[in-house]
Swiss-Prot record:
Pfam families: Mannitol_dh, Mannitol_dh_C. This is Mannitol-1-phosphate 5-dehydrogenase. Its EC number is 1.1.1.17. Belongs to the mannitol dehydrogenase family. GO terms for biological process: mannitol catabolic process. Keywords: NAD, Oxidoreductase. PANTHER family: ALTRONATE OXIDOREDUCTASE-RELATED (PTHR30524:SF0), MANNITOL-1-PHOSPHATE 5-DEHYDROGENASE (PTHR30524). It comes from Sodalis glossinidius (strain morsitans). It comes from the Bacteria. One of its GO terms (molecular function) is mannitol-1-phosphate 5-dehydrogenase activity. NAD(+) binds at V3, L4, H5, F6, G7, A8, G9, N10, I11, G12, R13, G14. The lineage of its organism: Bacteria, Pseudomonadati, Pseudomonadota, Gammaproteobacteria, Enterobacterales.
Length: 382
């Protein structure tokens, strides 16, 4: 089996590419970073530092790479068994034209073998969005063939992959946590889904996507925002602060109550899932900076993201939300000279004040009780 994987960054190499290669799949990475491409093609292997209770180094073998903008990518899409991507939500639209050209070549070559395409992004239904970009790049006469032969499979991914620490001169160096989860919507595959280790199939993907968003992503973000306010440098430092931990755990329990009401998750199993995530945040081998984790506050305070969406759920079901309110207030205090969204958020706050700024970004009613609660908590943190 041969896979073309867009994105040879840390997540591509440390998570999806590694999982595929470990399953015996031939992996060809596509990327624009020539230094990384050259290193992959010279070595055809790389090392991944996997950190859990201990740290160990594992070698990923049998890999190669091509430039994302090359004709090689088009030729590969015409012949491979699977296409995956871990490029970041904003980049999906950029890779769509190359995928479209590859599908045309596959069609024109008489290809009838099913091809499945999977975006492995930290977003809801990312592959469905990629599908729209690909269809937009294709002439309409190809659409029926694509519908028949190409599966666009949504997935939920979960693995903490922090940036490489300063001082490493190896372009392929990557560290990942031992925990990983890759859950795919089995109803969207064309043909028989591949049976690969580490790949889980479900017919209720939305439940698992929201479980991850409302628990890992919610908890990670609130740990970062409260951690920055408390003067902590890393996620580990922050979650070991009893005051931060209490609020983060409380927020995940509040969002968990929404999930239990909405999807019928088992309460005891979900409590264990929350505790597992808290342990992951404590990992001494992961030096995950709170400033990095908190980036893009405009997106993270958006209506469908990790802070506001669970809050809306508590309002829908009449559940407690005091810790989520505290976490959102902390997010409003986030600052970073490195993040354009943080600067944009600071300018909006200064221009219209916290109440109107939160309403504008989150979609919550400006005069609602919950916005007033968040603003009161925000002001109390001054």
């Amino acid at each position: 089996m041969k896979v073309l994987h867009f994105g040879a960054g840390n997540i591509g190499r440390g998570f999806i590419g590694k999982l595929l290669a470990d399953a015996g799949v031939e992996v060809v990475f596509a990327d624009v970073n020539q230094q990384v491409l050259d290193a992959l093609n010279q070595r055809h292997q790389y090392q991944v530092r996997v950190v859990g209770e201990q740290a160990q180094v594992e070698t990923v073998r049998g890999v190669s790479a091509v430039h994302s903008g090359s004709d090689d990518v088009v030729a590969l899409i015409a012949s491979v068994d699977l296409v995956t991507a871990a490029v970041g939500p904003q980049i999906l639209e950029r890779i769509a034209p190359a995928i479209a050209r590859g599908l045309v070549k596959r069609h024109d070559g008489g290809g009838t073998q099913p091809l499945n395409i999977i975006a492995c992004e930290n977003m809801v239904r990312g592959t469905s969005q990629l599908k729209q970009h690909v269809l937009n790049a294709l002439e309409p006469r190809y659409h029926a063939w694509v519908d028949q032969h190409v599966g666009f499979v949504d997935s939920a991914v979960d693995r903490i992959v922090p940036p490489v620490e300063a001082g490493s001169d190896d372009p392929l160096a990557v560290t990942v946590e031992s925990f990983s989860e890759w859950i795919l919507d089995k109803t969207q595959f064309k043909g028989v889904p591949p049976a690969l280790g580490g790949m889980e199939l479900t017919d209720n993907l939305m439940a698992f996507m929201e479980r991850k968003l409302f628990t890992l992503n919610t908890g990670h973000a609130i740990t970062a925002y409260l951690g920055q306010l408390a003067g902590h440098q890393t996620i580990r430092d922050a979650i070991l602060d009893p005051a931060v931990r209490q609020t983060v755990k409380g927020a995940m329990e509040e969002s968990g109550a929404v999930l239990i009401n909405r999807y019928g998750f088992d309460a005891r199993k979900h409590a264990a899932y929350i505790n597992k995530i808290l342990q992951r945040f404590e990992n001494p081998y992961l030096h995950d900076d709170v400033e990095r984790v908190g980036r893009q506050p405009l997106r993270k305070l958006g209506a469908g993201d990790r802070l506001i969406k669970p809050l809306r759920g508590t309002l829908e079901y009449g559940l407690g939300d005091a810790n989520l309110v505290t976490g959102i207030a902390a997010a409003m205090h986030y600052h970073s000279d490195q993040d354009p969204q943080a600067k944009e958020w600071a300018a909006l706050l200064a221009e219209v004040g916290p109440q109107a700024a939160l309403a504008k970004v989150s979609g919550l009613e400006e005069d609602s009780e919950v916005v007033a609660q968040v603003v009161n908590a925000y002001n109390a943190m001054q």
